Every structure is written in C-alpha cells, then in structure tokens.
Design a protein with these regions (language model features):
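Short, solvent-exposed loop/turn elements at domain surfaces
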Residues: 30-35, 71, 194-197
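Boundary/entry segment of secreted carbohydrate-active catalytic domains
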Residues: 13-43
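C-terminal active-site rim and adjoining tail of enzyme catalytic domains
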Residues: 185-238
C-alpha cells in the first residue's frame, strides 16, 4: 500500500515484496493416503491430491519423502508400513504440481521439500545399502528432467554475482516476488551425512537444484539461507 504525504505529490511506496516476506500454508507428507489397516493413529489421515491442495486449499509448501527402488526408481511414500500415496513416483508428484503451476502461471512461488530416505534393503541372498550419493543425484536429475529450468529457483539464481549464497541474501535480499511468480524452489530436507554428501559434491552449491536445510548457524558458513525452526518456545527469538 503506498504511503503518501498529505498535500504533496510525492508518494513513498513500501519496499517491494520479496520471497522471504511470504508466509505459506504447507502440508507434511503431502502425498499421504490413510492405510486400510493403520498400525497407529498417526497414519489415519488422507491428503487431497497435490494439485487440489494447491488450487482449492491454497497450499504453497509441499513435503515429499523419496525412496529409491532398484526396479522402479524414485518412489514417494511414508514408509513400508504406511505406503499409501496419491503420486507413487517422484516424477508423478512433480508432474501433478507442474500441471497446476502452468495452469496458474502467476502464482506465488511454491516450496517443495524433498526428504531422501534410505534403509537396508534385504535381497534374496545379500543385504545392500542404498548409496546416498546415488539417490541424491537421481533426485537432481529428475528435477532437471521434469521441472523446467526457467521455472526453478536455484542457489545460482539467488547468489547471482555475490561471493556466496548467505552474502547475497544478506546484502541483496531474496529475489523479488515479481521475479518468482510461477516458479518453484526445491529444499533438501536432510541433515547429517545426507546433507554433507550433497554439499561436498556441489561446492558452494554451484549448479545445485536444491537448497540445503539447516537447524542452526555455523555449519556451512556462506551457504546457510534455509532454516527449519520447529519449536516456537525454544526457537522463538530466532
């Protein structure tokens, strides 16, 4: 809303909106379908399909659990006891959101939180561990393949000509809202070894498709711009 001085032709406008000025409605396990036989009350809920969440419910932040299957590639579900999903593959989840996005090209930017999952897989005769670097690269590859580059907000976009990502955000700010409409930002929802592998393979996040998530400052100075603070009492001041 413009602020104008009474009796003057001068009108001072508020600073233009940037990405970080938004508050978004989000869903956790955004793909989830209640199992027929639920082992716990925590699984007893069903989300609308992703496109319906965006169009009818105003959701702009989505969270996807991504598993790697040796036969079927990247799958999306909660766990082996809670596997109901509205979009069984990472590709189908991206396609559902992209369809809505392209039909509503002026929408506020959406955030897609991607949580890679790994576990010991029991084979017929051997036990193998899914290689973390492999699933991370496959996720990157499918984002590249199934979400247009010109509709993706990447670390390179935010960094611009600055020396690092944190410096760019502190000095220049997040991208303007008008530059982000119709686009998506992908966030790597991982800590520990998974996040470290992702960042070690992509020094300075150059060429990365996802923004890593942090829970505190000082872990990767220069690249920390997305934080998850989930305790309003403990984290209130931050």
């Amino acid at each position: 809303i413009p602020l104008c001085l009474v009796g003057s032709e001068m009108c001072i406008r508020d600073s233009p909106l940037r990405m970080n000025h938004l508050q978004m409605k989000g869903t956790h396990n955004s793909y989830h379908v209640e199992p027929i036989f639920s082992p716990t009350r925590e699984y007893m809920y069903t989300h609308q399909e992703l496109g319906v969440q965006a169009s009818d419910l105003g959701v702009r932040q989505f969270e996807l659990d991504v598993w790697w299957d040796v036969r079927e590639g990247l799958r999306v579900y909660h766990n082996q006891y809670d596997s109901g999903t509205t979009c069984p593959t990472f590709q189908s989840c991206l396609e559902a959101l992209l369809l809505w996005s392209q039909e509503n090209s002026q929408h506020h930017p959406i955030m897609i939180w991607v949580e890679p999952k790994d576990w010991l897989e029991q084979g017929a005769e051997i036990t193998t561990t899914v290689e973390l670097t492999g699933i991370l690269q496959e996720i990157e590859d499918e984002i590249t393949q199934f979400w247009p580059a010109n509709l993706t907000i990447t670390p390179d976009d935010v960094r611009g000509n600055a020396l690092n990502l944190t410096g760019a955000v502190l000095d220049e700010g997040w991208p303007l809202m008008d530059e982000c409409r119709g686009k998506a930002m992908f966030v790597l929802l991982a800590t520990g070894d998974m996040r470290d592998l992702y960042m070690d393979e992509r020094p300075g996040l150059v060429g990365a498709k996802m923004f890593p998530m942090f829970t505190s400052q000082g872990q990767y100075p220069g690249e920390e711009v997305i934080f998850s603070l989930t305790d309003p009492i403990t984290d209130g001041e931050e």
